[in-house]
């Protein structure tokens, strides 16, 4: 079949009755989790660079808050020296090898009973340590019992110092039925836009979690974008028209993992059919945008990354 590229008007209606929809997602729920899901705000070790009112709202919308090692410094500094404010925004966990956590910040959060877990292994990243921890928190009563036992406080909460989190996680997954696990909405601040190798690693986690822990719904939020994975073989992205009109700009369909075929899109300014896309060839759908009145359909041969431009100063009114 020959490839096509169709330029659409700025607003079109999308009929979904004849579309083969394998997956559905709501754009706003990447930031405002569904109440039927477990949810986590993960702060990675980059400057927090979104408006404070938006940060406070996002914080309150998530069940669990986790700082990856030096990200605790970022949170501490973001709240300046306002102690009455800082005490309201204590993370549930700080985890990592703690090499980048300042002594002052460590003492502050330890004094305020934040659970701080040291993991010294250099064979996994702080991101992976955080993800294993988050899964254990929601899915392992044994882990929660360890954490709540005050007798374990002085011994790293009873968790082996090198890679205890990974050991506990691997043991848990031996009996975990993924299809019965409550989904975990995971919104990550940071991880994109700092050191390039760390940015690439962050992108790999979208693929890794989709393959190995599919109950996670990971999205990265930056001051300019939401970045997430679109599953292959037909995904419908739903959104409120006013939310789209006010908070959303351009988008890009990015074949970062591998070259693939966009079998069909419906609801983009430039829709395509049977369209090969590849970073190597330079055929990438960038600077596109949603024009479907309340949804967009994307059908690809393989999983693909989507970035969606956001206007962070407008988001607060829709959360």
From Swiss-Prot:
What Gene Ontology biological process does one annotation of this record name?
Answer: thiamine diphosphate biosynthetic process
The EC number(s) given in the record are 2.7.6.2
InterPro entries per record: Thi_PPkinase (IPR006282), Thiamin_pyrophosphokinase_euk (IPR016966), Thiamin_PyroPKinase_B1-bd (IPR007373), TPK_B1-bd_sf (IPR036371), TPK_catalytic (IPR007371), TPK_catalytic_sf (IPR036759)
- Pathway(s) it belongs to: Cofactor biosynthesis; thiamine diphosphate biosynthesis; thiamine diphosphate from thiamine: step 1/1
Name the catalysed reactions: thiamine + ATP = thiamine diphosphate + AMP + H(+)
Modification sites for N-acetylserine? 2
Q: Which GO terms describe its cellular component?
A: cytoplasm
Per the entry, what induces it?
A: Expression requires the positive regulatory factors THI2 and THI3. Incompletely repressed by exogenous thiamine pyrophosphokinase.
Q: Which cysteines are joined by disulfide bonds?
A: none
Q: Name one Pfam family in it.
A: TPK_catalytic
Please provide, alphabetically and separated by semicolons, the GO molecular function terms listed in this UniProt record: ATP binding; kinase activity; thiamine binding; thiamine diphosphokinase activity
- On whether Kinase is a keyword of this UniProt record, the answer is yes
User: What keywords would UniProt list here?
Assistant: Acetylation, ATP-binding, Kinase, Nucleotide-binding, Transferase
Instruction: Give a short account of what the protein does.
Output: Essential protein, it is the only enzyme in yeast capable of synthesizing thiamine pyrophosphate (TPP).
Miscellaneous note of the record? Present with 3320 molecules/cell in log phase SD medium.
What's this protein's name?
Answer: Thiamine pyrophosphokinase
Write down the species. Answer: Saccharomyces cerevisiae (strain ATCC 204508 / S288c)
The organism that produces this protein has a lineage beginning with: Eukaryota, Fungi, Dikarya, Ascomycota, Saccharomycotina
Q: What is the gene name?
A: THI80
């Amino acid at each position: 079949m020959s490839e096509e590229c169709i330029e659409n008007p700025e607003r079109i209606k999308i009929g979904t009755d004849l579309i083969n929809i394998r997956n559905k997602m709501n754009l706003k729920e990447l930031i405002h989790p569904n109440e039927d899901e477990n949810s986590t705000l993960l702060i990675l070790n980059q400057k927090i660079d979104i408006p404070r009112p938006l940060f406070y709202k996002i914080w309150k919308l998530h069940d669990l808050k986790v700082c990856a090692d030096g990200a605790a410094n970022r949170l501490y500094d973001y709240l300046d020296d306002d102690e009455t404010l800082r005490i309201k925004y204590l993370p549930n966990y700080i985890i990592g090898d703690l090499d980048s956590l300042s002594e002052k910040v460590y003492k502050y959060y330890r004094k305020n009973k934040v659970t701080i877990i040291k993991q010294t292994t250099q064979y996994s990243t702080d991101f992976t340590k955080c993800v294993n921890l988050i899964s254990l928190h929601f899915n392992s009563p044994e882990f929660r019992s360890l954490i709540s036992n005050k007798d374990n406080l002085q011994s790293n909460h009873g968790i082996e110092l090198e890679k205890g989190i990974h050991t506990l996680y691997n043991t848990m997954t031996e009996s975990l039925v993924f299809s019965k696990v409550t989904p975990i909405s995971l919104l990550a601040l940071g991880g994109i836009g700092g050191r390039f190798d760390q940015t690439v690693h962050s992108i790999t986690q979208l693929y890794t979690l989709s393959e190995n822990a599919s109950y996670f719904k990971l999205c990265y939020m930056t001051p300019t974008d939401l970045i997430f994975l679109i599953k292959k073989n037909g995904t419908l992205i739903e959104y409120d028209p006013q939310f789209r009109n006010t908070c959303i700009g351009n988008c890009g369909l990015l074949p970062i993992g591998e070259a693939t075929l966009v079998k069909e899109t419906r609801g983009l300014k430039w829709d395509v059919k049977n369209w090969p896309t590849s970073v190597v060839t330079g055929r990438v759908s960038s600077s596109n945008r949603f024009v479907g009145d309340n949804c967009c359909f994307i059908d690809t041969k393989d999983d693909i990354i989507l970035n969606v431009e956001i206007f962070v100063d407008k988001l607060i009114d829709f959360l």
